[in-house]
Amino acid sequence: MSLLPILYYPDHRLRQISKPVNKINNSIYRIVYDMFDTMYHKNGIGLAAPQVNINLNIIVIDVSENKEQRLVLINPELLAKSGETGIHEGCLSIPEQHGFVPRAKNIKVRALDLNGNSFNLETNDLQAICIQHEMDHLVGKLFIDYLSPLKRQRLLKKMKQLIRNLD
C-alpha cells in the first residue's frame, strides 16, 4: 500500500461535506488500506477520507495500543449519544496543536463495513471520542471549531508558521 498526503488546516478542502460511498469495490479497499498505512505512519488513532483529499464518507480508527483493532466505518450515522466527556484532542490535519473538546461519552453508530454489510456499534470513552472527531471531518467540521475565537486565531497563526516551515 502507500502513504497518502494529508491536508493541513487551513486548507479549504477540509471544510467540504463528503459524499456517501455508493459501491464498495477495489478502489474503496485500496483507499481504506492506504488510510490505515497513513494513519499508522503518522501515529494517529483515526483518519477520515477528507483529510487525505478523498471526498467520501470513510473513517478508519484504531485506538488500541498494539494497533491490532482496526475499525472501518463507511457512511457512518450517529444513532444515539449519552453522557458527557472530553479530552484535549489533536488532529493529523492540525499537527502539534490540541484543544479541549466536549463530546458524548457513549455513542451508537450505524455504518457499512468493507464487505458492504451494515452494522451497529455501541462504544464509549476514547473510541467514541475518536469516532465523533472523525465524523466531524465528514461534514467539514474540525476540533478547533469547538474552541473560543481567540484560541482558534492563535492556533491559525501557529499553523501558518508551521506550514511555512514545512515548505
Swiss-Prot record:
The GO terms describing molecular function are: metal ion binding; peptide deformylase activity
What Gene Ontology biological process does one annotation of this record name?
Answer: co-translational protein modification
Record: residues binding Fe cation: C91, H133, H137
Protein purpose: Removes the formyl group from the N-terminal Met of newly synthesized proteins. Requires at least a dipeptide for an efficient rate of reaction. N-terminal L-methionine is a prerequisite for activity but the enzyme has broad specificity at other positions.
- Which cofactors go with this protein? Fe(2+)
Matches recorded under InterPro entries = Peptide_deformylase (IPR023635), Peptide_deformylase_sf (IPR036821)
Cofactor note text: Binds 1 Fe(2+) ion.
Can you tell me which family this protein belongs to?
A: Belongs to the polypeptide deformylase family.
Q: What is its EC number?
A: 3.5.1.88
Keyword terms of this UniProt record: Hydrolase, Iron, Metal-binding, Protein biosynthesis
The protein's enzyme class: hydrolase
Q: What protein name does the entry list?
A: Peptide deformylase
Can you state which reaction this protein catalyses?
A: N-terminal N-formyl-L-methionyl-[peptide] + H2O = N-terminal L-methionyl-[peptide] + formate
Q: Which Gene3D superfamilies does the protein's record reference?
A: Peptide deformylase (3.90.45.10)
Active site located where? E134
